A protein has these predicted regions:
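Ribonuclease/tRNase effector modules and their secretory precursors
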Residues: 1-95
Length: 95
């Protein structure tokens, strides 16, 4: 999956910082730092499928970033980001 552009709506940016203590910068780092990506669910309309990216920030923080991928524009639209759960972290370690 090729990601050329990363978009984070302002309302999502606020939620990431207030609810999950994750900055957009950290979420971008995960998406650009060779994450493990998995399909989460099919979108209601074609081209709006949800994916999860699991990886590390440059500071070493393990995050799960959820995004909608627009293949025609190679764009990831960030929907949510949070610390990896213990189960996700264990699975990520087996990469």
């Amino acid at each position: 999956m090729k990601i050329d552009f990363i978009v984070c709506p302002e309302s999502i940016e606020y939620k990431l910082e207030s609810k999950h203590s994750v900055t957009v910068r950290e979420a971008r780092q995960v998406l650009l730092n060779n994450p493990r990506i998995r399909f989460v669910e099919k979108g209601y309309t074609k081209g709006n499928d949800l994916y999860g990216a699991f990886g590390q920030t440059l500071a070493g923080r393990y995050l799960s970033v959820f995004f909608v991928y627009k293949p025609e524009m190679a764009t990831a639209i960030i929907i949510s980001a949070r610390n990896m759960s213990k189960k996700e972290r264990k699975s990520y370690g087996k990469k």
